[in-house]
Amino acid sequence: MEQNEVKKLLHHRDPYLMVDRVIEISPEYIHSQKDMSSHVITGGHFPGAPIVPGAMLQEMCTQAAGVMISKFHAPVEDYDSEKTKGYALGVLSEIKNAKFVGMTRPDQVIDIKVKLENKQRSRFDFTAVVFQDGESRAAISFQLVNIPSDLL
């Protein structure tokens, strides 16, 4: 799935859209990728020795999970980010645990692998691992919720 299809499932837009492509997706799993080489944030974090901020790695995981929710777990049929039908999908409600290992550099593709661990009504618990060059860079567990858009 390329980014134009991702945009139908997520409200995020550049420069904050953190899913460039989806490699694999199912109702319980998503593998997405992000290329940060020319991203605006990398020039200032840190000049001369750029690294991708941990908060951005978390956001990549959250957005990948949001794609999965929009595609397979939306409370309305044919969800489209332009026609939300009254819902905000995949709103971050909790970061349960986050561990960052090593430095994630913006000059290589970042792989994000997210697994749906539990679903109860409109609450979704996920675990995610962020990889770069085949090595784990972060392990994150978090919760997203679907809410009526009038609560935003």
How should each PLM-predicted stretch be described?
Residues 1-6, 110-111:
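Short Pro/Gly-enriched beta-strand edge/turn motifs at strand-loop
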Residues 11-52, 56-57:
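Catalytic strand-loop segment that frames the active site of acyl-thioester-processing enzymes
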Residues 52, 57-71:
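Active-site- and interface-proximal helix/loop "cap" or "latch" segments in soluble metabolic
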Residues 66-111:
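Hydrophobic beta-strand-centered segment that forms part of the acyl-chain substrate-binding groove
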